[in-house]
């Protein structure tokens, strides 16, 4: 029995979900998301709730049960409230700015790092050392943040680099004489 999959997903006001030809579509005030459904699970929309159940007792079907339910819940929250993550930049001279549809970062390299902002993502820089990534697709917001962090991950000696807000960096002591 899936402890995640057995709970129905409640639909907030203004969110509608339709299932057509194995594709689940969620529409809300912030936009629309689509997701192909696995043939191993059955998805039913009724009474303002989405219920996911496995089609058989196989292990793969039970795995997809909880995964599908979690993905549907993420889509519902995305089209109703959206997702946002904040990155912090630490380091002397390290900064970021949005120029047109690109994010330009100075991260201590001999060149600027230019990151084209993907469709469906909004990036803002309130301060030169802070990057806010917003969107309706939780997976895409997390992926963009991971790609930005990968340009210069925080190093353990001084903590310089790009990190998530609130992320604890494991620090090391420098060498001793």
From Swiss-Prot:
The keyword Ribonucleoprotein applies. One of its GO terms (biological process) is cytoplasmic translation. One of its GO terms (molecular function) is structural constituent of ribosome. Gene3D superfamilies: Ribosomal protein L6, alpha-beta domain. Belongs to the universal ribosomal protein uL6 family. This protein binds to the 23S rRNA, and is important in its secondary structure. It is located near the subunit interface in the base of the L7/L12 stalk, and near the tRNA binding site of the peptidyltransferase center. This is Large ribosomal subunit protein uL6. The gene is rplF.
């Amino acid at each position: 029995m899936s402890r995640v999959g057995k709970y129905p997903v409640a639909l907030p006001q203004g969110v509608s979900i339709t299932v057509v030809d194995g594709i689940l579509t969620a529409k809300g005030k912030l936009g629309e998301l689509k997701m192909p459904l696995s043939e191993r699970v059955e998805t039913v929309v009724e009474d303002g709730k989405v219920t996911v159940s496995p089609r058989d007792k196989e292990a793969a079907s039970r795995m997809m049960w909880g995964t599908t339910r979690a993905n549907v819940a993420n889509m519902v929250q995305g089209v109703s409230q959206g997702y946002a993550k904040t990155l912090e930049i630490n380091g002397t001279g390290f900064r970021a700015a949005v120029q047109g549809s690109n994010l330009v970062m100075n991260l201590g390299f001999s060149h600027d790092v230019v990151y084209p902002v993907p469709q469906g993502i909004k990036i803002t820089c309130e301060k030169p050392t802070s990057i806010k990534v917003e969107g309706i697709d939780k997976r895409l917001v997390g992926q963009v943040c991971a790609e930005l962090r990968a340009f210069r991950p925080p190093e353990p000696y001084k903590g310089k680099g790009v990190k998530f807000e609130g992320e604890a960096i494991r620090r090391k002591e420098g060498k001793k004489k």
